[in-house]
């Protein structure tokens, strides 16, 4: 009896377990049918190999729906029991279309902040800033150290998800990016080429000759070769004792490549090279400041943080690069001695006299601060030296920004998604014997290497860390990243909210905050003070009067018409003339067309870029100068130009107000308010026709006291 009873109980128990297994299988099938493919466990963290599971855990697998298992009673076999299928990972409800998995509206082209690592961490701590260093090239070592010091997260091989910051080694176009921040401006490489820089500075020299006398007089070859010969001969005829020296620099050259000195224009190497490789010839600075009887220059690092509004920072320290032969004024016998005349590091490192030193104040490469200390010990006014250098940097950037704006709107048109930009520039400055700073050139990609090559044996080299380079360059990169930190403002806003009364209750309702961050935790507490000093807009009041070409660029961009183009067509130029009411009985529209054709044809023949037809910005500036000189004949050029800009801006503001009224209706008070007409400068400057007289507050603009920039 017991045995039969136990067998029947066992069979009943097996049957009950089989029924339970069938029910579990049916439930699993229902869940699998509702969600055809199980949700992926984690979003792919990208090519950098971000871990998707905690250490020691097994990666969950995506399982296909399991077929329902029949019960033992249905099969007629109570002896063979099949186990229920393994349990699927717990599934999350599908997000509503247009919303992210957390119920937030989706941003077009952007992932959910939490799922992509853009929200707060699971433990309530702020997520680290992410940096894509896959295109960093020679600056990679210094960048890695900077990221490590900041405790940010580096992606050395890129990432599928967007990063906060992209670090490019060459240009803006190293990567195709549509969000975040990138350390290059579009067009910067083209703008600091020697010919383009010389033209930009020359435009400013025409307007403000005394303010821009820090750049040597330059001629562009081959276009201005005959002009160069004629002007040199004219000066020699007036002063037979004048024995100049000139330096020839290839337009696209770098690291001293192709540079040579001449005493006479006939010494220029014309044989085929200038046509394929244009160049700039400049007056050579024959009386530089010497230290230890050696010529040297200064590499200063300048951060262009923003283009509009303009923000400029200068590093408090830089590098001083020395020649390796004692300096002598140039003569026909020593013109070829490059180690005496050229300060380029890439040239002098091959000299047998080059001295590598870990000390900041000795060797062939030293810190600029050590040079200032040495000058200060001799009684030199260091504040005056710094003030003059800051002035050179600001004025140079003001000369570059107009055309940079045109490049920027071409690559990142207004209203379209795109990254924001910043860039570290290398300014090469020479101090003359009287301590006046002279701008030699600007580098879009200054070397950020922190090691040098050491020759172990003939032809065998190894890379050795350079403590001087590391001291200066790591600080520049690290503090640039600190200034560009995209989460800094968010942290500050959160701290301010938590300091308010009852802020805790409001934060509890905020879905973005999983827990309150520690207000007292300063992520930069362990870092030294920032080595970058803001100089603009800090000193904007002293330099804004120079930004005339910048205002012309705004007019130029307004009438471009097609987004993404960089040249103004004939229709756009006519529209500019009509909108600003510049045509008159003495300047017909036919004359305007001829002006456009003549200037555009000449500038297109001088530039190598023939991708687009039309009027470039420099051609527009020349046409604008011509119109200003016709309209305001009794004023200096900079006042003529300022008056015409004021007139154009006045008429365009009226046009904008008229469009606003047509779109929204006239306010109940009657006529819409607008700026009054500009004040009349003098009867001779009265515009023709019914045009209101322009404002000419240039006297006030130019009467700025010359403060020391500390």
Swiss-Prot record:
> What are the Low complexity biased-composition ranges?
64-82
Residues binding L-glutamate, per UniProt: 321, 345-346, 365, 473
Indicate, by first and last residue, each region the UniProt record lists as having compositional bias (Polar residues): 123-135
Which segments carry the region annotation Disordered?
Answer: 41-135, 665-710
Q: Which UniProt keywords apply?
A: ATP-binding, Cell projection, Cilium, Cytoplasm, Cytoskeleton, Ligase, Magnesium, Metal-binding, Microtubule, Nucleotide-binding
Where does this protein hold ATP? Answer: 249, 255-256, 282-285, 295-297, 343-344
Gene3D superfamilies recorded? ATP-grasp fold, B domain (3.30.470.20)
The EC number(s) given in the record are 6.3.2.-
| Residues flagged as site, Essential for specifying alpha-elongation versus initiation step of the polyglutamylase activity | 255
Q: Is Magnesium found in the keyword set? A: yes
Q: What class of enzyme is it?
A: ligase
Composition-biased stretches, type Basic and acidic residues, lie in 51-60
Q: Which positions does UniProt annotate for Mg(2+) 2 binding? A: 441, 443
What protein name does the entry list? Tubulin polyglutamylase TTLL11
Task: Identify the taxonomic lineage of the organism of origin.
Answer: Eukaryota, Metazoa, Chordata, Craniata, Vertebrata
């Amino acid at each position: 009896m017991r045995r039969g009873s136990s067998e029947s109980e066992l069979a009943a128990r097996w049957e009950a377990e089989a029924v339970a297994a069938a029910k579990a299988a049916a439930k699993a099938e229902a869940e699998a049918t509702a969600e055809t493919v199980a949700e992926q466990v984690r979003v792919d963290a990208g090519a950098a190999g971000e871990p998707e599971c905690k250490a020691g855990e097994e990666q969950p697998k995506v399982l296909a729906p399991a077929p329902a298992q029949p019960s033992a009673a249905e099969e007629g076999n109570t002896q063979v029991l099949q186990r229920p299928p393994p349990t699927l990972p717990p599934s999350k409800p599908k997000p509503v279309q247009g919303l992210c998995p957390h119920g937030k509206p989706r941003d077009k082209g952007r992932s959910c902040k939490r799922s992509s690592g853009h929200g707060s961490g699971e433990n309530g701590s702020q997520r680290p800033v992410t940096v894509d260093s896959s295109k960093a090239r020679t600056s990679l070592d210094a960048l890695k150290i900077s990221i490590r010091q900041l405790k940010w997260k580096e992606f050395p091989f890129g990432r599928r998800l967007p990063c906060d910051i992209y670090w490019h080694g060459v240009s803006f176009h190293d990567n195709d990016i549509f969000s975040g921040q990138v350390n290059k401006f579009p067009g910067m490489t083209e703008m600091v080429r020697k010919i383009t820089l010389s033209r930009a500075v020359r435009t400013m020299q025409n307007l403000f000759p005394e303010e821009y006398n820090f750049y040597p007089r330059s001629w562009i070859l081959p276009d201005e070769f005959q002009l160069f010969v004629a002007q040199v001969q004219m000066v020699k005829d007036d002063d037979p004792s004048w024995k100049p020296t000139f330096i020839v620099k290839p337009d696209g050259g770098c690291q001293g490549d192709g540079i040579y000195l001449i005493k006479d224009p006939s010494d220029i190497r014309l044989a085929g090279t200038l046509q394929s490789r244009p160049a700039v010839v400049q007056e050579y600075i024959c009386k530089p400041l010497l230290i230890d009887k050696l010529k040297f220059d200064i590499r200063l690092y300048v951060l262009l943080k923003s283009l509009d509004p303009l923000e400029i920072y200068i590093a408090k320290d830089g590098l001083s690069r020395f020649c390796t032969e004692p300096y002598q004024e140039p003569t026909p016998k020593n013109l070829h001695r490059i180690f005496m005349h050229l300060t380029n590091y890439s040239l002098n490192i091959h000299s047998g006299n080059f001295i590598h030193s870990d000390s900041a104040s000795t060797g062939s490469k030293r810190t600029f601060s050590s040079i200032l200390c040495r000058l200060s010990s001799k009684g030199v006014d260091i504040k005056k030296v710094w003030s003059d250098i800051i002035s050179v940097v600001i004025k140079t950037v003001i000369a570059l920004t107009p055309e940079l704006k045109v490049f920027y709107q071409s690559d990142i048109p207004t209203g379209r998604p795109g990254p924001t930009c910043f860039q570290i520039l290398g300014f090469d400055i020479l101090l003359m014997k009287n301590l006046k700073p002279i701008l030699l050139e600007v580098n879009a990609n200054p070397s950020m290497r922190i090691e040098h090559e050491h020759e172990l044996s003939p032809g065998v080299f190894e890379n050795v860390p350079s403590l001087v380079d590391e001291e200066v360059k790591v600080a520049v990169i690290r503090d640039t990243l600190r200034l560009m930190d995209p989460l800094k403002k968010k942290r500050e806003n959160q701290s301010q909210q938590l300091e308010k009364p009852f802020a805790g209750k409001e934060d509890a309702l905020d879905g973005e905050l999983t827990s309150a961050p520690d207000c007292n935790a300063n992520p930069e507490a362990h870092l030294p003070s920032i080595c970058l000093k803001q100089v603009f807009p800090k000193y904007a009041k002293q330099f804004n009067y120079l930004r005339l070409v910048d205002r012309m660029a705004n007019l130029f961009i307004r009438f471009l018409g097609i987004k993404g183009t960089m040249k103004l067509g004939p229709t756009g130029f006519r529209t500019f003339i009509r909108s600003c009411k510049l045509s008159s009985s003495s300047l017909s529209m036919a004359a305007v067309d001829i002006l456009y054709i003549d200037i555009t044809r000449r500038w297109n023949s001088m530039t190598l870029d023939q991708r687009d037809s039309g009027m470039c910005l420099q051609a527009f500036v020349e046409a604008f100068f011509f119109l200003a000189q016709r309209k305001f004949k009794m004023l200096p050029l900079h006042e003529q130009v300022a008056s015409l800009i004021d007139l154009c801006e006045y008429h365009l503001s009226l046009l904008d107000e008229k469009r606003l009224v047509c779109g929204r209706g006239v306010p109940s008070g009657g006529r819409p308010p607008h700026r009054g007409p500009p004040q009349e400068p003098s009867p001779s400057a009265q515009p023709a026709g019914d045009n209101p007289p322009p404002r000419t507050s240039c006297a006030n603009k130019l009467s700025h006291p010359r403060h020391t920039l500390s």
